[in-house]
Regions:
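Pyridoxal 5′-phosphate
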Residues: 1-359
């Protein structure tokens, strides 16, 4: 509200005090994001969401980087946002998409990654934490293995950055995408991180104001340096400023405390869910925020609607990971997503509500 009330101006355009204030606040958020994940400020570009970031990475960089016959490694537990852009790229270029096998617990192992690499493999695009199984992938080890074989790594961090202390330099990941709205921030703000030397090799996907230095009527254009090169048009100023405040709040609490709280709550929830005979948990031994389950004889949608009547919000369906059903052997599930604002009393209420089911 402060932005709208006191300095509601556009960014990077105004030669007046409220414009300078907007530029200062956007720079502040960029700095906070860079510090939060251990990156340089010019390696942080603002986007609309994780989906937008992944599309820009895949179609803005890899369309030029990959050649016919090059192979991309994915997994069948990826979110649509880390699959569909690759499918689109495959329509434009003669690339090959292969899938890293999942183990019996639907997890990715370094050994399975190693076995999947061929001389043609050029990129591994993988979630750090998946949004259905909730498994945390060994990204640092995968990056080390990939780089030993001259392979780049794209990381979908939508489910990990809000929950786990991340340092991109330590992980050595080449690209990382995540969203503000999963970490107490507003919708409509995403982050594209990339190593500086890679970001300078992107082709522009969206062009216009704010991302050029000069252009002339004959079509000659000089584009801005990174990260402004990725930020054409008027940005979501209010959202970006708010995201900076969200990061400050998370830092004040401490990511380690958040992770401990969520894991303790998850263990408690799983132990209580196991008391209900008709509940099947698909990711019992995972140490992240996600619990995926079904209730015997009730569709996931019907269960979610029943819980909604009691003011309990769970996600039902395929969770945008429609290929995973081939591995799970079922079409849909219910998903509980825990965060720092949840508590044991809420878990107890959920369990009692589930125990009250009669049919």
């Amino acid at each position: 509200m402060e932005y709208y009330n006191y300095y509601s101006a556009n960014a990077h355009r105004g030669d007046y005090d409220i414009g300078f204030k907007v530029d200062e606040m956007i720079t502040r958020t960029r700095y906070l994001v860079s510090e939060f994940i251990g990156a340089k400020e010019n390696e942080i570009a603002f986007t609309n969401n994780t989906t937008d970031s992944l599309n820009k990475i895949i179609l803005g960089f890899f369309e030029n980087y990959l050649s016919d016959g090059d192979e991309v490694l994915l997994t069948k537990s990826e979110h649509a946002s880390n699959l569909l852009p690759w499918f689109e790229l495959k329509k434009r270029k003669n690339i090959v998409i292969n899938y890293i096998p999942l183990d019996e617990d639907l997890m990715v192992t370094v050994e399975n990654v190693r076995r999947s690499i061929t001389p043609k493999t050029k990129v591994i695009s993988i979630a750090h934490v998946t949004n259905v199984v909730g498994d945390e992938r060994p990204i640092k080890e995968i990056c080390s293995l990939a780089h030993d074989n001259n392979i780049l790594v794209v990381c979908d961090g939508a489910q990990s950055v809000p929950h786990i202390k991340i340092n991109v330099k330590d992980l050595d990941v080449d690209f990382l995408a995540f969203s503000a709205h999963k970490m107490l921030g507003p919708t409509g703000v995403g982050i594209l991180y990339g190593k500086e030397e890679l970001l300078t090799k992107f082709k522009p996907l969206i062009v216009g104001g704010g991302m050029n230095v000069t252009f002339s009527s004959d079509g000659n254009v000089t584009y801005s340096d990174i990260p402004f090169y990725f930020e054409a048009g008027s940005p979501n100023v209010a959202g970006i400023i708010a995201f900076g405040n969200s990061i400050k709040y998370l830092n004040e609490i401490g990511m380690e405390k958040i992770e401990d709280h969520v894991l303790n709550l998850r263990q408690y929830a799983v132990s209580k869910l196991e008391e209900i005979e008709d509940i099947k948990i698909y990711n019992k031994n995972i140490n992240t925020s996600i619990i995926t389950f079904n209730y015997n004889g009730i569709s996931s949608t019907d269960l979610a609607l029943y819980l909604n009547e009691h003011n309990i919000c769970v996600r039902a369906g395929t969770h945008c990971a429609k290929v995973l059903k081939d591995e799970l052997g079922i079409n849909d599930t219910c998903r509980i997503s825990l965060y720092l604002y949840n508590n044991k009393e809420e878990i107890d209420y959920l369990i009692q509500t589930l125990k009250n089911i009669t049919y």
